[in-house]
Amino acid sequence: LTLTLPLTPDQQDAAVAFSAWLDRPGDGTPFVLSGYAGSGKTFLSMRLLARADAAGLCWTVVAPTHKAVGVLRQHLQLAGLQPTWFPSTLHRLLRLKLRRERDQECCEETALTAAALEHLALVLIDEASMVDSALLEILLRCAHPYRTRLVFVGDPAQ
């Protein structure tokens, strides 16, 4: 249903840019989809994932929180999309161990972290503005050896 609704002109521009990015050989440059609340980022994300799916890519979606992952799962189901890997938190995908250090949670890499993205061609990271620099650094390092394409979706106001 949602994949048949028309796109706004801005969404069309983003979809064209995504297709061009997807058609180029992966060079480690991520695709960034940025927009304010209510601008249709999630709606457009489903279209972009349908394009990746049609290209035969192994893909999944992640978010920093379980609540955001739940929202993504609902939208994927409504769009009739089935990711290669079950949607999860970014921490789970990267096989990170969470530990408390003083009053903060810290991510600790495990023996499985380095190869976490080995079989994925594309990962869409929703709520990307909530990903801290340490987690981003781990994600980029894990994606690099496998040329896993990263799509960051976020709100510039957050």
Regions found by a protein language model. Give the residues of each.
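Conserved ATP-binding/catalytic motifs of P-loop helicase motor domains
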Residues: L1-Q158
